[in-house]
Amino acid sequence: MGSEARAMAKAGPASGAAGYDVERIRADFPILYREVHGKPLVYLDSGASAQKPRSVIEAMDHAYRFEYANVHRGLHHLSNAATENFEAARETVRRFLNAGSAGEIVFTRNATSAINLVANVLGQKEIGEGDEIVLSIMEHHANIVPWHFLRERQGAVLKWLPMSDQGELLIDELDRMITKRTKIVAITHMSNVLGTVNPVKDIIHIAHAKGVPVLIDGSQAVVHMPVDVRDLDADFYVFT
């Protein structure tokens, strides 16, 4: 019996809270059978790069072995099958977010690429010298660097929504900060450092009342809570 099989055999009944079987969840991730410095691996960096459960690894392995082909670029059997699977994945994401249609789902490499895409399009069409972008001081770099680049290229102004000593955004300041020059508000749904869950629905309502679109960085939120993009009414909701 190999080390992985022995580890699986040791997986016992639920050891966490009711309905939350920690050992069963760990058993689904092959990498967690490793030991580091003589102790079981505990991985806490999923916000940056998540480990893959066995089902994902096996699905990717199967696709590369038996189904790989161009998507939306061929008429042969493998290409058609790959396209169907690709669009099925888009529909799965749509259901996950309760988006209005699969056409609203745009695949990118990661959240940074998604925000770059929005920033570049707005920069070409909407944002010029002196126009404003409202961010918060609790943003991940993925939601800071693209706007810094846009500021350097276009001469835009970055404005920063402050937070309290308790790590909560001062939402009352937002209404005052938004002016006729404000082109977008870009805010994290959940802080990757503090764990603060921001009232993004209220933020979106305030911005929309002044005709300003909103981008929400949901990278931390989507794995910790249900997200309904139709209920939030965000213009852009990105995650990785």
Where are these regions (language model features)?
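Pyridoxal 5′-phosphate
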Residues: 1-240
